[in-house]
């Protein structure tokens, strides 16, 4: 129903900002029964992002792999195919399975980049250490600068939105690389 679709629209920014207190109960429980069938893939994605936000990376990886196995179609793809692989990569990175992280990133790049989709890599630039940057340099050098440019352009805007949305403060003094290093130290 429309109330649940409104919750979907409100839940996504909460998950993106790591504001887990605003995530709907039905997303936390993975209960998509009130969503229209067309909206269930988005509900599933939000539930997976919820696992990421809770740092439940082993569960996230298993759930994403299952979703890929059930969702994937041989002759076509959707944006969800790319984002599921990006979530797998993030989970693997956090589980110190860097080679597997790279495999998932390369699968996502193989689908996305020939079609001009850079946003998934911009959005995940910070969640996989320097892996995206290294893989772009090695395998897709023509895409490295465009992805980095868009990433840099959105970084400060993301911080401003985050600070207003969560009423918390992330400094704008650090570069993305410095911020990644600070995250690793913490």
List where the protein language model places each region:
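Helix-turn-helix DNA-binding segment
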Residues: 162-186
């Amino acid at each position: 129903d429309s109330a649940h679709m409104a919750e979907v629209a409100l839940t996504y920014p909460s998950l993106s900002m790591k504001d887990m207190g605003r995530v709907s109960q039905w997303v936390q429980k993975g209960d998509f029964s009130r969503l229209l069938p067309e909206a269930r893939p988005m509900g599933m994605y939000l539930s997976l992002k919820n696992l990421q936000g809770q740092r439940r990376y082993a569960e996230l990886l298993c759930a994403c792999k299952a979703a890929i196995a059930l969702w994937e179609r041989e002759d076509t793809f959707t944006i969800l195919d790319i984002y599921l692989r990006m979530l797998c990569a993030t989970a693997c990175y956090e589980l110190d399975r860097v080679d597997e992280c790279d495999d998932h990133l390369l699968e996502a790049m193989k689908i996305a980049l020939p079609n001009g989709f850079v946003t998934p890599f911009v959005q995940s630039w910070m969640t996989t250490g320097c892996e995206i940057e290294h893989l772009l340099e090695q395998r897709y050098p023509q895409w490295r600068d465009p992805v980095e440019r868009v990433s840099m352009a959105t970084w400060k805007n993301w911080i401003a939105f985050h600070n207003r949305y969560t009423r918390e403060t992330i400094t704008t003094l650090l570069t993305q690389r410095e911020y990644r290093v600070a995250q690793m130290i913490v």
